[in-house]
Amino acid sequence: MAMKRWRSVRATPEERLHALPGDELIKEPIGSLDHAITIRRARREVWPWLAQMGAGSRAGWYSYDFLDNGRRPSAERIIPELQKLAVGMIFPALPGATDGFTVLAFEPQHFLVLGWTTPDGARLMTWAHVLEDGEHGSTRLIVRARAGPGYRFHGLPWWATKRIVAAIHFVMQRKQLLGIARRVERGAIIEMVAGEQP
């Protein structure tokens, strides 16, 4: 049996240095993590999957559902009623949660910036999903997570937080990027096959 090809989610050095939407919301981050994937479809076909993210009544995070979606499978289709966004909307982090990621900024088919803030409004982190045109009609999905000065993982000092969060984030983010790419590209195959039917 042939081994499954490893698909990279590594951001290029240029992408790591490139300013992205949402960077201005945390001007002096204490940490930043970048990942990216090339999706073989146009931006307009990737965007709906980003717009409907979130746990609980939303489409899921397309990652490890037993960890971040209460074992409920993430959606395998675009859900029209979840496509409308507004700044200030909450994407529940977990099923049943009353808090979660707040929509801080978005531009359809270009970027979605989510964030986590404290009750007093201090911004702890931002999580930007950015769509850029790639070669041959593809899309480059770049994801950047930035931590503000107050960010800590279960009260641990920053040097420990950085190592733990980087490892967890890589695992979950890789799964999400692969999950989004699979859904978008599979939709293209379904459309192609359907178009061949008599």
Where in the sequence are the language-model features?
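A short, structured loop/turn motif at beta-sheet edges
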Residues: 40-44, 104-109, 130-140, 182-189
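Edge strands and adjacent loops of beta-rich recognition modules
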Residues: 88-99
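A structural signal for well-ordered alpha-helical scaffolds and beta->alpha junctions
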Residues: 43, 96, 173-177
